[in-house]
Structures are given as C-alpha cells and as structure tokens.
From Swiss-Prot:
Binding site for substrate: T49, C50, N51, R52, S109, E114, Q115, Q116, Q120
Taxonomic classification: Bacteria, Bacillati, Actinomycetota, Actinomycetes, Mycobacteriales
Stated name of the protein: Glutamyl-tRNA reductase
Function: Catalyzes the NADPH-dependent reduction of glutamyl-tRNA(Glu) to glutamate 1-semialdehyde (GSA).
UniProt-listed PANTHER family: GLUTAMYL-TRNA REDUCTASE
Top enzyme class: oxidoreductase
Length: 453
C-alpha cells in the first residue's frame, strides 16, 4: 500500500477554481465516505484550508486510485476532469510524504512559515480518525508530519515574524487606511472560528480601539469579544442580523466563515454605507479570507470600499521567511523524511523476517517429531538437549542474515530484500505472517504525476 496525494492550491489554481474545489467541514465526512467506498483506497485524509485542498489516500494501485480520487473531486467541484487536471498536482509514495512534511513546516504556504497549517492538518487528521478512515499509515504519516512541523517552528526562525494570511491582509488594510493605520480604528470580524480568533488577536496587537464580532451564534461571538475585552479592547459580540449596523461604524472588516455562498451581500454593504451615523469620509477595507469567498464580488465596485481577497493577496505575495531559515527548515524536512522512510521500509521487512523464523521453527518441530518416531528410546532429558541444540543451530544460522537484511532494508530500494527472502524461502507474499499490512512508501518514484497519468 502506498500514499497518493491529489491536490489543488494557491500555487496551481486561481481563486475561482479553489472556491469550487473547497471542502468545508460539512463536505469532508461525505467525501471521505466516498473515498473509502472506492475499490483501491483503504485510508484517507483531506487537508482543506483557505488556499489548498489536498486528498491523501492509501492505495493499492496508482492508476486506479488516481482515477477514483479525480472523479470524486470533479463531482464535488462540478469541474470536468480536464479542467481539474489543469490545476491539480499529484504526488505518489515518497514524494507525497515529502510534500506533507513541507506543508506542515509552512514551506508551501502563501506566507512562508505561517503556523496555522499545523492546526489545519491536526483538524484533518482528527476528522479522518473520527470516521475510522485513518489506519496505520495515515496515523503514522499525520503524526510524523505534525512532529516535523513543530520541530521546524521550534528549531528555526521560519516564523519569527509571526506572519500569517491574516497578518498580511491586515497590514495591507492598514496601508490603505493611511496615517496611523489600525490604531484607534473600529473593526468588524465576521466568524468566530479559529481564523476569527486569529484576526481578533492581530487587531488587538495593532492597536485597534473597538471590535465587533459577528456570528450566526451570538454566544460564540460574545465569547470571542470577551477575549478582546480581556486584552483591553472595547468589544461586543452580536448576531448576524446586526451585520449592517456593525459595518456602518467600521474602518476594516475581516471575514473567514467557511460558508458556501456570499455571507456579506451587496445589499448588506449598501445598507451599512447608508446608515445615518456612517461617517462618509471613512474608507472601508474588507479582508475576505474565506474560501469560498464570503463577500459578493460586486462589493469591490462600490466607491469608498476596498476588498482584499485571497486572489488579491496571491497577486502580490508578502515577503516570507528569510532564505536561511527556509533552507534550515528544508534540511530538517529532508532528514526527517529519510528517517521516516527508513522506518517504514524496516516495518515492511520485519513481518517477512518473522515469517522466516516461524518457518524455521516449524521445520525444527517437524524434525523433532520425526526424531521421536525414529528414536523412541530417548528419555526426556536427552530429547530436550537435542531440541535445544537444534534450535541453537537454527538461531545462529538465521541471526546474521536476518540482522543484515533489516539493515539493508532501511536503505532506499530495501523492499527488494524482503521480496528476495520471500522468494528464496517460499514465503507467500499474501500470507499474514509474511506481510502484515506493509506501508510500502518507497514503491514508486518521487516525481509529481499528472492527474490523467
């Protein structure tokens, strides 16, 4: 079994395509069920963020599984396979593992070094586990990716600037607002999830004077507002029907709800701008960080309003981590990848070694029974001594080659040694004793492949 990755991200697709492929928390369980119902897929995990969707599947056949994943994503997005192919990337085996480690480290993010991806991978893993879609391979892969990401962030300065999509968007907003930036201004945050919490934290550090949190569940909005108040910021949490009134006072608004369809309509913004207490000299900057987008695209055409969405941020990416920090992170990823793959190769050969020792033990027992029939006069002490001697001989004969084959198996191409043992000693590759769910993460090349390969 090998790992197959099919993904679409900010590096390969424009925002309109990402919107169609986007996987919400509601979508994810349904898609995982479809993946597990496929004939070539035994485990699955879906990583979905504001600028990427990646399906990780444990498969028994590359081409068959690639077709199945492609069809499921095409059906979900409404894109035909040709259109999906134009924006998708495929990684297989070692390359899929390497990619996830790089993603967890923040090396593939739009803002290099951002830490939010770790929480998003953790959420994807938890969702997979909750649906019993995570077997041994996904468990080990996800856990190791999280460990690698944490190590990169703790041992390098890749996130020393504390940059994230939220911070980059708010920095741009401050520049548009002009003198003083966000200091003393009023902000609206739409959505009380993790991105909403991150927005409140950044706004607080930027010196914002007032925050209004808008959420469909007012209790959650109030809880997030209390966090802001505890840090000395005037804040309220309101229900969604208060959105226009809240916008009327705002200099900046941040949205990232994960909802399907426009959460903030053109009519909502018109009402806000028409509120009698709206200061018409204010410029409203809206940071739409949702995928799909939360803001009706027509809002961008209104005078006195600037919309910064993921497409805008992609066109003018922020400076990422220092080159030296990114290089240090890549070095860690490369070392961790080598260690992980060596462990997986060793895990593959171990069941074969166990089967070989069991085969030898069975032969010894059969010969001892044959000895009993040929020399019935042996007393128990004599028979025990013969048995110990035969077993010692067998153990000594097997010790060096089995230790050596484990050493050799941990190197690239090591799976061939397990195959050689099975062939030489007639150990059936389908036997549970010979092969106990091997990971086989090094079966295949490291290059990306087309979706229609």
């Amino acid at each position: 079994m090998s790992v197959l990755l099919v993904g679409v991200s900010h590096r390969t697709a424009p925002v309109p395509v990402l919107e169609r492929v986007a996987v919400t928390d509601t979508d994810r369980p349904k898609l995982i069920d479809k993946l597990l119902a496929s004939s070539h897929i035994s485990e699955a995990m879906i990583v979905s963020t504001c600028n990427r969707v990646e399906v990780y599947a444990v498969v028994d056949a590359f081409h068959g599984a690639l077709t199945e994943v492609g069809e499921i994503l095409a059906d979900h997005s409404g894109l035909d396979l040709t259109a999906l192919h134009a924006h998708a990337y495929v990684r297989y085996s070692e390359a899929a593992v390497e990619h996830l480690f790089a993603v967890a480290s923040g090396l593939d993010s739009m803002v290099i070094g951002e830490q939010q991806i770790l929480g998003q991978i953790r959420s994807a893993y938890a969702s997979s586990d909750a649906q019993q879609a995570a077997g041994r391979v996904v468990h080990e892969l996800a856990q190791q990716a999280l460990r690698v990401g944490k190590r990169v962030h703790s041992e390098t300065g890749i996130d020393s600037a504390g940059a994230s999509v939220v911070s980059v968007a708010l920095d741009r907003a401050a520049g548009i607002i002009g003198e003083g930036g966000l200091v003393g201004r009023t902000a609206v945050v739409v959505g009380a999830g993790s991105m909403g919490g991150l927005s409140v934290a950044h706004l607080t550090r930027a010196g914002i004077a007032r925050i209004v949190v808008v959420n469909r569940t007012q209790e959650r909005a109030e809880h997030l507002a209390e966090t802001a108040r505890s840090n000395g910021v005037d804040a309220d949490g309101v229900a969604f029907d208060q959105l226009s009134a809240a916008m009327a006072q705002a200099d900046v608004m941040v949205t990232c709800t994960g909802a399907v369809g426009a959460v903030v309509t053109l009519a909502d913004v018109h009402r806000a701008l028409a509120e009698p207490d709206r200061d018409n000299t204010k410029h409203l900057v809206i940071c739409d960080l949702g995928l799909p987008r939360d803001i009706d695209p027509a809002v961008a055409g209104l005078p006195g309003v600037t919309v910064l969405d993921m497409e805008t941020l992609q066109r003018d990416p922020a400076a990422g981590a220092a080159a030296s920090d990114a290089d240090a992170a890549r070095t860690i990823v490369a070392g961790e990848l080598a260690t992980y793959l060596a462990g997986q190769r060793l895990a593959e050969v171990t069941p074969t070694v166990t089967a070989l020792r069991q085969r030898a033990a069975d032969v010894v027992e059969a010969e001892l029974m044959r000895l009993d029939s040929r020399l019935p006069g042996l007393d128990d002490p004599q028979r025990d001594e013969v048995a110990r001697t035969v077993r010692r001989v067998v153990d000594k004969l097997l010790h060096a080659p089995t230790v050596r084959v484990k050493q050799l198996a941990s190197a690239p191409g090591g799976d061939s040694y397990a195959a050689a043992l099975r062939e030489l000693f007639e150990l059936s590759p389908g036997s549970p004793a010979a092969v106990a769910t091997p990971t086989d993460l090094v079966d295949g090349d490291r290059t990306g492949r087309d979706l229609q390969a």
